[in-house]
Amino acid sequence: MTKKKLIAGNWKMNGTLGANAALLQALRGGLEAGAYQNVDVAVAVPAAYLAQVQGLVEGSAIALAAQDVSRHEAGAYTGEVSAAMLQEFGVRYVLVGHSERRQYHGETDEQVAEKAQRALAAGITPVVCVGETLAEREAGQTEAVVKRQLAAVIHLNGHCISETVVAYEPVWAIGTGRTATPEQAQQVHAVLRAQLAAASEHADRIRLLYGGSMNAANAAALLAQPDIDGGLVGGASLKAQDFLQIIAAAA
């Protein structure tokens, strides 16, 4: 079964009202000018800009994504944003378990699984992020780490795991300019695909994204791998031309 590739931009904690408008105008123009109907495109924006970006992408091929969601339904959780709130802004995807959330906010595998569950219940596709640190890779633990991270999500959401997207982001390659080789990335994606296949008969439907310094120069080689179904793009998604080149590589 042929899946549409998914190229999702993660703006992280970047943007201004003016810069967002200019970036999305350029992105819309580029998408309308090119033949990219076979690629799904999303932008994950800071929560403060969800309303603005919802308006800016309306009627376009760009789907709105959020960078995080609360594992709680509602209530006294100051600073958190619920899945129901994201749903009201037309959010289609939400990142859960990004390495920066795990690293700086101490998110556990179980909490990430709960966030995925909240998103799924609200009809939002969770983009479940998994990946190993440099120390873990050098200790030969890559496979064990990503399988452990994904297992928690499968355990809690097994019945609808085929409704998720999984992103492999080697932590040592995020924002460092270092990239996993296409072969290294494919090796891990194949492990994840096998783990998903053991949990769901619809594993072939699940899109596996690569997220670790994907850019215009390396996107085509990464996306040519059999189990890489798209990209979770950081820095390059803040420049319209770079992001469009990655989308073109997926088309």
Curated annotation (Swiss-Prot):
GO terms for molecular function: triose-phosphate isomerase activity. Its main location: cytoplasm. It catalyses: D-glyceraldehyde 3-phosphate = dihydroxyacetone phosphate. GO terms for biological process: gluconeogenesis; glyceraldehyde-3-phosphate biosynthetic process; glycerol catabolic process; glycolytic process. It is found in: Cytoplasm. It is an enzyme of class 5 (isomerase). Its EC number is 5.3.1.1. InterPro entries: Aldolase_TIM (IPR013785), TIM_sf (IPR035990), TrioseP_Isoase_bac/euk (IPR022896), Triosephosphate_isomerase (IPR000652), Triosephosphate_isomerase_AS (IPR020861). One of its GO terms (cellular component) is cytosol. Pathway: Carbohydrate biosynthesis; gluconeogenesis; Carbohydrate degradation; glycolysis; D-glyceraldehyde 3-phosphate from glycerone phosphate: step 1/1. The keyword Lipid metabolism does not apply. Pfam families: TIM. Keywords: Cytoplasm, Gluconeogenesis, Glycolysis, Isomerase. The active site is at H98, E169. It comes from the Bacteria. Substrate binds at N10, W11, K12, G175, S213, G234, G235. Homodimer. HAMAP family: TIM_B (MF_00147_B). NCBIfam families: tim. Belongs to the triosephosphate isomerase family. Involved in the gluconeogenesis. Catalyzes stereospecifically the conversion of dihydroxyacetone phosphate (DHAP) to D-glyceraldehyde-3-phosphate (G3P). This is Triosephosphate isomerase.
